[in-house]
């Protein structure tokens, strides 16, 4: 789990420009609701055609999600990369991390994204995300299982200034440091070496 913060550690195996990346991480299951993300991503591409979506994880819905991407004719914009030992190089190169879960335990992956200074857009699902994120302050929360509200929050993200996004990232990282439930990890900051 130890990594050095290297923004320059590129995702060389992908034949895409290393910007305009959205990342989703988790088991490809109903709970994680990646179907919502894929359907929303189709609409994102209408406004922001240079984006790509990276999904990290395995699960019983993988084939169905790949078929949905083909049905929507966006399969060339989505990379299903399976389980990855090192998610950090993806988080460090992403514009934003999106969590679309229908329900969630306090999300460890949200903490990882915040410590990588990756902007977070998350469903306001039961447990977890709203214990860490305050919408508009240190990230963006959208109504659970609501594509329209997700797209609204994504537009807020895109319309934010660099200074506003920098402040949100800083406050998210600060909140993670105060998040006592994960104190038994001896502070993620000491495990995940960041500048």
Predicted regions span which residues?
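A short, well-ordered alpha-helix in the C-terminal region of glycosyltransferases
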Residues: 163-178
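Aromatic "clamp/platform" in nucleotide-sugar-dependent glycosyltransferases that forms part
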Residues: 83, 102
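C-terminal alpha-helical cap of glycosyltransferases
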Residues: 181-195
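Acidic anion/phosphate-binding donor-loop and adjacent secondary structure
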Residues: 1-14
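Conserved acidic donor-binding segment of nucleotide-sugar-dependent glycosyltransferases
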Residues: 134-136, 140-147, 155-162
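Short hydrophobic beta-strand element within catalytic cores of glycosyltransferases
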Residues: 119-123
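Nucleotide-activated donor-binding/catalytic signature segment of Leloir-type glycosyltransferases, i.e.
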Residues: 66-82
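A conserved mid-protein helix/loop that constitutes part of the nucleotide-sugar donor-binding site
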Residues: 20-46, 53-56, 60-66, 108
């Amino acid at each position: 789990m130890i990594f050095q913060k290297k923004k320059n550690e590129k995702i060389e195996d992908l034949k895409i420009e290393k910007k305009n990346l959205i990342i989703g991480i988790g088991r490809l299951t109903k709970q994680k609701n990646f179907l919502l993300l894929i359907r929303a991503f189709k609409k994102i591409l209408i406004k922001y055609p240079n984006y790509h979506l990276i999904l990290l994880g395995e699960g019983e819905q993988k084939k169905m999600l790949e078929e949905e991407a083909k049905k929507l004719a966006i399969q060339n914009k989505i990379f299903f990369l399976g389980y990855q030992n090192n998610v950090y190089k993806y988080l460090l190169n992403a514009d934003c991390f999106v969590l679309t879960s229908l329900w969630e335990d306090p999300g460890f992956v949200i903490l990882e994204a915040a410590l990588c200074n990756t902007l977070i857009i998350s469903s306001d699902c039961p447990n977890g995300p709203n214990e860490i994120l305050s919408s508009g302050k240190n990230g963006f929360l959208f109504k659970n299982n609501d594509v329209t509200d997700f797209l609204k929050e994504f537009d807020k993200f895109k319309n934010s200034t660099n200074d506003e996004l920098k402040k949100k990232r800083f406050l998210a990282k600060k909140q993670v440091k105060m998040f006592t439930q994960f104190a038994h990890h001896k502070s993620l900051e000491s495990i995940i070496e960041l500048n």
